[in-house]
Each structure stands twice: as C-alpha cells, then as structure tokens.
Amino acid sequence: AVPIAKQELCKVIKFMARRLKNEGIEVRMNCEVTPEMLAGEFKDYEVVCSTGAVPKEIPPFKVFKQTMTADDVLAGRKYPGRKIVILGGGSVGCETADYLAPLIDDMFPANRDITVIEMTPSLMPGEGGAAKSQLTMRLKRKGVKIELNSQVTKVDETTITYEKDGQEYHITDADTLIFAVGYAPNKVENTEERVHFIGDCDKVGTLKDAIAAGHKLAEEL
C-alpha cells in the first residue's frame, strides 16, 4: 500500500520502469546478489548498491503483545488491531495513521482508535508546506489522538507508559504498537573500489536525494 499523501509517487515508479524497459535494461526480480556472483558473472562490472534502508525498532519495547513497523503495515505484511499506538510522529508515522484511520465521513468506518506519540513539540518536525498542514488537519478530522512533547518510558506486555509535561500516563487498552522511529542504512559490507552506494543505503534521505545521487554517480561513471 501507498500512504494517501504519496499516491502520486506511484507515477514516478511507473515512469522509471518504462524507461528501463525502453532502454532494454535487464531487470532480474527475486534475485539475491551473492559474493560469488560479483566475483564471477559481474567481475568486470562497476557495482551500484541501492539496497535502501531498514526500519528501526526499539528492542525493549517489543515485549508488547503485538508490535510491528510502519513498513510492515504499509506493505501488508502485518495487520494491526483496533486500538493502535504509533510511536513516532514524523512523516512516516503520520502517513501510517492517515492510512489506518477511517475515511472522513465514512459510512462504514473501521472503528480504529489511533494514538500518535511524538517526543518533539510538533508533528513531522523539519518538514513544512501545504502537505504537512493538510495531513495534520486530516488526522484531526479523522479523530487521531496526537500526543506531543511525549516520551515513552516503559512498555510491558499490556501497558504503554509515557511522560508528558512531568506527568506519567498509561495506555492499557491498546492491542498494537507500531514503530515509526526512523530508518537505518541497509548497507552491504564491501570495500572494493568498484562498489558504489547510493540512496538510503548510503545515507537515509528523500526520494529526490536518491534520484540525484543516482544521476550524479552515472555521470561520474
């Protein structure tokens, strides 16, 4: 699935797929690249690694009865319950809340109760513009609970505890905890000069950053 606010990105992916096909570039799906493959079939090739990033989790909090990442939800790998807490109010956390919450004025709502916990004073810190304002307003209209300046301090199998303004609060009726706490580069360990890293596997950034890095490397090669 694609977050509601990023449906237009599908057009970019389809455009790039058409470009690859038109240029006659071979694409191998479901193919794991191994050291043997690099040393054999591709021994004379420059290798560009764009393996992306992996979502971060907080191991001590995984004791909760059901945990998953925002990526798990959006990719359809896991299915949350009805009482959901999303840890992290960045763009991914907010987009996941938007995706899971009932549509505005939905005649058959999903009846999900969603709480977003963010440790900074605002949602999607570091971002701005109309898209941020529209997403924030949409979350409020959908009834998503937003807890800012809040820090989760303890999680056990049934309870999520967080602090806000010096007070301690306990969420005891949640059935799902979703991690939206950032990403870490999924970098392949290889020090050969012919291996190049671009995109999130080099440094976590935006789609624009990844495309620019690919273009720059192609010019250099």
Residue locations for each model-derived region?
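Rossmann-like dinucleotide/flavin-binding elements
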Residues: 28-40, 50-66, 70-127, 155, ...
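Rossmann-like dinucleotide-binding cores of NAD(P)H-dependent redox enzymes
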Residues: 1-23, 98-152
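Short low-complexity stretches enriched in small and charged residues
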Residues: 4, 40, 44-46
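Short amphipathic alpha-helical surface micro-motifs
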Residues: 8-10, 49-50, 66-68, 143
